UniProtKB/Swiss-Prot annotation:
This is Transcript termination protein A18. Interacts with G2. Might be part of a transcription complex composed at least of G2, A18, and H5. It is found in: Virion. DNA helicase which seems to act as a postreplicative transcription termination factor. Involved in ATP-dependent release of nascent RNA. Forms a stable complex with single-stranded DNA, and to a lesser extent RNA. The keyword DNA-binding applies. One of its GO terms (cellular component) is virion component. Its main location: virion.
Length: 493
């Protein structure tokens, strides 16, 4: 730990990384406070900040030669086989770490790699190279299985802890596994933090973007007060301010053969309203809608739009155009609505729900990976980041209010490299609730723009359903309605 006075140059360097947000650190009294320019207090500067050689410092940091937390059970023949692009990442990491050791810099690296790159297998390869006892920290239980599979493939002795940190600490008195796989809430326990700081050299923070380290969280406190000897942050969408805790970044572009298309399912709706909708509309401009809660609630009860989503999905699934579908909503009640309706159509052998309130959901996710055809309905919170179903070929985004980081993570669920190359995303920019039509159009346009401009998707209009089903709510049977549709869409965007 390094307690330093906040001099001008240090403050400027740290503040630059927050991209205009407030800069918060632990002060000498242990309080997590916002740092003001010219402050006379001393602050705890994160170890990982000094991993970049561009940061000037006279501090000298320990290297691995001073510890003895080595893995003794490594068999080099068990190291996973990597693609050439993954080997390039490994080469970059090894080269950077040699320089860090030479310069006495902390061995902290952020692996900023695209969704579907194979961050888990690449990091397991690095873990085998380092040969150091490792803690893998994940934000939720759902991500544990993919790490377990890769760690077992490398042949390392490991322990998974999901039943509570107190039970784990008791077990660690009689055993010392080479790899610990834990959920991040374990870091709220100081005794556990002290233990891994002493007995484990490598700390891997998976999905690091899910943690805002400018907040006083368990991960923030751990990295500040119990900094590991080596650390990897893994993410496809890094938070700029998190660089303060891990200031060396490796980012290698990934070329893909995937054919990625985002289908814009336009429709012209007659205005739709109910007593419930009218009641929620009154709350749109109030403080209760600060995070667009009521905007999403209105979408969840927009019956014509919901029916359009269902009609599109059913037609595409029945035709065999898509086979392994992820349906994403923002709200749980919206998820349950789609699940029940799809369950009535296709049955429990095909339709599954990714419910955060069901403890069996992670086991269910494992079971559907081998299915040739399925529909998985879940929420953005549960399945928007880290969902490990590589075979997904299509995504239906029923929500609208999603930030850029969430959009990129969500689209990454259908960008995993497999033998099948076609990937389809369906978005629905229209609503029958006139009070939110422009807002929804703008939010969905942001999804479209990011997918095309940054992630390499091709945009196409989806017309099949409207032309083939004259009885649906989204029928455009006349030339006049098609003209109105085009006018409406141009206004929406």
């Amino acid at each position: 730990m390094s307690l330093l006075k906040m001099e001008y140059n240090l403050y400027t360097e740290l503040k630059k990384m927050t991209c205009g947000q407030s800069l918060s650190l632990f002060n000498e009294d242990g309080d997590f406070v916002e740092v003001e320019p010219g402050s006379s207090f001393k602050f705890l500067i994160p170890k990982g900040f000094y991993s970049s050689p561009s940061v000037k410092t006279s501090l000298v940091f320990e290297t691995l030669t001073t510890t003895d937390n080595k893995i003794t059970s490594i068999n080099p023949t068990n190291a996973p086989k990597l693609y050439p692009i993954q080997c390039k990442v490994v080469s970059e990491v090894v080269s950077n770490m040699r320089k860090m050791i030479e310069l006495k810099r902390p061995l902290y690296i952020t692996l900023h790699l695209a969704c579907g790159f194979g961050k888990t297998i690449t990091t397991c390869y690095l873990m085998a190279i380092h040969g150091r006892k490792t803690v893998i920290c994940v934000p939720n239980k759902m991500l544990i299985h993919q790490w377990k599979t890769q760690v077992e493939a490398v042949g390392l002795e490991h322990k998974i802890s999901i039943d509570g940190v107190s039970i784990l600490l008791k077990e660690l008195k009689t055993q010392s596994p080479d790899v610990l796989i834990v959920v991040s809430r374990h870091l709220t326990n100081d005794a556990f933090c002290k233990y891994i700081n002493k007995h484990y050299d490598l700390f891997i923070l998976d999905e690091s973007h899910t943690y805002n380290l400018m907040n006083n969280t368990a991960v923030t406190r751990f990295l500040a007060y119990y900094p590991p000897m080596m650390c990897y942050f893994l993410t496809a969408t890094p938070r700029p301010s998190n660089r303060i805790y891990c200031n060396s970044i490796i980012n290698i572009a990934k070329l893909s053969d995937l054919k990625k298309t985002i289908y814009v399912v336009d429709s012209f709706f007659e205005p739709y309203s109910t007593d419930n909708i009218r009641h929620m509309i009154k709350r749109l401009d109030g403080a209760s809608n600060k995070y667009h809660i009521y905007t999403e609630k209105l979408l969840s009860v927009d019956e014509p739009r919901n029916q359009l989503i269902l009609n599109t999905l059913v037609e595409e699934f029945k035709s065999g155009t898509i086979n392994r579908i992820l349906v994403i909503t923002k709200l749980r009640e919206h998820m349950v609505l789609f699940y029940k309706r799809l369950l009535n159509l296709f049955g429990p052998e095909v339709v599954f729900i990714g419910d955060a309130q069901n403890r069996r959901t992670p086991d269910m996710v494992k079971s559907i990976k081998e299915l040739n055809r399925f529909i998985f309905v879940s929420t953005l919170f549960y399945s928007g980041t880290g969902l490990d179903i590589p075979s997904l070929d299509s995504l239906f985004i029923c929500s609208a209010v999603i930030n850029n980081m969430q959009i990129e993570q969500l689209l990454g669920r259908v960008c995993r490299e497999t033998a099948l190359l076609d990937r389809r995303v369906y978005v629905f920019p229209n609503t029958s609730i006139k009070e939110i039509k422009y807002m929804i159009g703008n939010f969905v346009q942001r999804i479209i723009s990011l997918s095309v401009d940054k992630l390499g998707f091709k945009q196409e209009s989806y017309r099949k359903h409207q032309e083939s089903d004259p009885t649906s709510a989204c029928t455009t049977s006349s030339r006049e309605e098609r003209v109105l549709n085009r006018i409406f869409n141009s206004q929406n965007r």
